[in-house]
């Protein structure tokens, strides 16, 4: 059975891991880094992902960042002269992770466990699954990020019973989950969060401050300059990271724009105290979900044994202090906040494949599910923090006499009125026999699978007619669209492989030309003109093919040159070996001729 890789598909950075034996291992990317920027660039028909894409973000307008924040929406991004769905961009990141995982493992990878924020709704989960499919991956399981982190933390502690709070502040999302660990069971008791809070928001506070200060000083608004804005974003991210280790950092952006008098530079010092002041409201927003999760789990702070920090943004000192103040506990630092989620996903892959025994994961649905009923009321069928998979049915009736059909409006959220919650989908149950209002019996059943993806069934108990849908929001992709995108992704992969092969061939040609020219020069006047002429002729032919750019011709001429150059090299080595042998023979003969010289007779006297 092929390996099931674990993928943390992050807003800012992503990571991929695999189970080796019983231990999860992070796979480094081609640049040797253990996390990969979730950045995609398009340049000259080429798709660039990761570190290389991030490096050119300042100068390349066709660069897409933080696509995860758009997952589950109908919003598209424009790049490379066309529009892409969030699923397509995410698929390019997944395809890149899959590619270097395959290189590391030396085998094809077709299956993955992908993590999502615990507070992702159904549309966002479905979009993530679709992205995996487009990338050529069978998504075996969608796992909540805090749950994956708990798996990685608790894998070697299965004999110990404890309750843990996972505080997960990533690049674009924030989750808090409370789990109970014991006897190999990872039971999620409650989860809460904010899908619009993350490291990007902390960066934005610094950007806004820099824009404001520069405008005060120079009267120019940098927020309208796209290239300047990207430089500000890079500087803000760097300053934020610096301030996790030092109390003050210098921001220097020469030639940020031009004024009437010439070029202008941005120079400022940002202290940690100022940064804390700018981001105080963001840190404050992390407190409510912590309290909500504890309340939903029916626990008090004294019941929590460990607090685990996950996500790069938990390195911000003010965030760490807020966690300490809110929980009264020193956070556990035994896990790497950037890597632990991917490692947990790899462990879940091992559970699915049977490589990890005696581990059971019980996750929950983060938001309540229900339908709209008379008066625009949201009637919940499944409460938030219900363990999944689960199923729940409830019987409803018609609101009017002789009503021939009922509209089922499926929603997700916590507000009492339907209009204030997230619409997951709508469908209709028709051909209801004429009857007074309140008489027909319509049974509505909600099913949530292990990935947190919802399907809904409505059944007329009188006629036994039923209608079932797997929820597809207005951002969902049809099977045909996914199929087309999969083909596009495969074509891109083939084009990338072809481009790589072309570069390798051109490098081989350059190397062969250099080596052969060197050999021809070294063999000048050494007496094997036939082989030299043949190599020179093959060399000239290869140079012509190189100029024409015909790859097939280059390949054929390269093979021909290698053959002739090898024959010439053999002659050269044979000559060198013969000369060495002759020299060794001459030295041996000389030693024999001189063997009688300088011999002195001596007497030996025994005492």
From Swiss-Prot:
Q: Which Gene3D superfamilies match?
A: 1.20.1270.10, 3.30.420.40, Actin, Chain A, domain 4, Substrate Binding Domain Of DNAk, Chain A, domain 1
Q: Where are the transmembrane segments?
A: none
Q: Tell me which CDD domains the record gives.
A: ASKHA_NBD_HSP70_DnaK-like
Region labeled Disordered — which residues?
A: 579-607
The yes or no answer to whether the keyword Cell wall biogenesis/degradation is present is no
Q: Write down which residues bear the modification named Phosphothreonine.
A: 173
Start-end of Low complexity biased regions: 579-591
What Pfam families does its record include?
A: HSP70
Nucleotide-binding recorded as keyword: yes
The molecular function terms in GO held by this entry are:
ATP binding; ATP-dependent protein folding chaperone; unfolded protein binding
Enumerate the UniProt keywords alphabetically. Answer: ATP-binding, Chaperone, Nucleotide-binding, Phosphoprotein, Stress response
Record-linked InterPro entries: ATPase_NBD, Chaperone_DnaK, Heat_shock_70_CS, HSP70_C_sf, HSP70_peptide-bd_sf, Hsp_70_fam
> For bias kind Acidic residues, which ranges apply?
595-607
User: This protein's superkingdom?
Assistant: Bacteria
Family classification: Belongs to the heat shock protein 70 family.
User: What HAMAP family does this protein map onto?
Assistant: DnaK
What's the stated role of this polypeptide? Acts as a chaperone.
Q: What name is this protein filed under? A: Chaperone protein DnaK
Source organism of this protein record = Streptococcus thermophilus (strain ATCC BAA-250 / LMG 18311)
Q: What is the lineage of its organism?
A: Bacteria, Bacillati, Bacillota, Bacilli, Lactobacillales
């Amino acid at each position: 059975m092929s390996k099931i890789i674990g993928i943390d598909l992050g807003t800012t950075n992503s990571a991929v891991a695999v189970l080796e034996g019983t231990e999860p291992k992070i796979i480094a990317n081609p640049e040797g880094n253990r996390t990969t920027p979730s950045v995609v660039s398009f340049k000259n028909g080429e798709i660039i992902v990761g570190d290389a894409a991030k490096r050119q973000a300042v100068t390349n307008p066709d660069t897409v960042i933080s696509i995860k924040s758009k997952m589950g929406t109908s919003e598209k991004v424009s790049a490379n002269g066309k529009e892409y769905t969030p699923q397509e961009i995410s698929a390019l990141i997944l395809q890149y992770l899959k590619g270097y995982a395959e290189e590391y493992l030396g085998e094809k990878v077709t299956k993955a466990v992908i993590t999502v924020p615990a507070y992702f709704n159904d549309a966002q989960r479905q979009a993530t699954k679709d992205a995996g499919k487009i990338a050529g991956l069978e998504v075996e399981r969608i796992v909540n990020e805090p749950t994956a982190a708990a798996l990685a933390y608790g894998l070697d502690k299965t004999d110990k019973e404890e309750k843990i709070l996972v505080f997960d502040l990533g690049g674009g999302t924030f989750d808090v989950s409370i789990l109970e660990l014991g006897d190999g069971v990872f039971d999620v008791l409650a989860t809460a969060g904010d899908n619009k809070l993350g490291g990007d928001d902390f960066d934005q506070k610094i950007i806004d401050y820099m824009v404001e200060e520069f405008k005060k000083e120079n009267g120019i608004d940098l927020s309208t300059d796209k290239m300047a804005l990207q430089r500000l974003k890079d500087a803000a991210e760097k300053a934020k990271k610096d301030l996790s280790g030092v109390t003050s950092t210098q921001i220097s952006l020469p030639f940020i724009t031009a004024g009437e008098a010439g070029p202008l530079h941005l120079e400022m010092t940002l202290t940690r105290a100022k940064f804390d002041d700018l981001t105080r409201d963001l840190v404050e927003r992390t407190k409510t979900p912590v309290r909500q999760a504890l309340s939903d789990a029916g626990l008090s702070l004294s019941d929590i044994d460990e607090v685990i920090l996950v996500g790069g943004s938990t390195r911000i000192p003010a965030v760490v202090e807020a966690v300490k103040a809110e929980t009264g506990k020193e956070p556990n630092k035994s896990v790497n906040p950037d890597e632990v989620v991917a490692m947990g996903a790899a462990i879940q892959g091992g559970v699915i494949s049977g490589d990890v025994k005696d581990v059971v994961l019980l996750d929950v649905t983060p938001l309540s599910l229900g339908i709209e009923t008379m008066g625009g009321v949201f009637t919940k069928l499944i409460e938030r923090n219900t363990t999944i998979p689960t199923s729940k049915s409830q019987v409803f009736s018609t609101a009017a006499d002789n009503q021939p059909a009922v509209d089922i409006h499926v929603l997700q959220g916590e507000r009492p009125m339907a209009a204030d919650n997230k619409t997951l989908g709508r469908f209709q149950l028709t051909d209801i026999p004429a009857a007074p209002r309140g008489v027909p019996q319509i049974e509505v059943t909600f099913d949530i699978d292990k990935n947190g993806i919802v399907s809904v069934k409505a059944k007329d108990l009188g006629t036994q007619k039923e209608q079932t849908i797997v929820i597809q929001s207005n951002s969902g992709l049809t099977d045909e669209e996914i199929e087309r995108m999969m083909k596009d992704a495969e074509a891109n992969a083939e084009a990338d492989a072809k481009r790589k092969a072309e570069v390798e061939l051109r490098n081989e040609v350059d190397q062969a030309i250099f080596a052969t020219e060197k050999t021809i020069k070294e063999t000048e006047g050494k007496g094997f003109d036939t082989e030299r002429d043949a190599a020179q002729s093959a060399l000239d032919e290869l140079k012509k093919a190189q100029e024409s750019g015909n790859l097939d011709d280059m390949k054929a001429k390269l093979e021909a040159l290698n053959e002739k150059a090898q024959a010439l090299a053999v002659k050269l080595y044979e000559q060198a070996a013969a000369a060495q042998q002759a020299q060794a023979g001459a030295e041996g003969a000389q030693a024999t001729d001189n063997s009688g010289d300088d011999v002195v007779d001596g007497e030996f006297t025994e005492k």
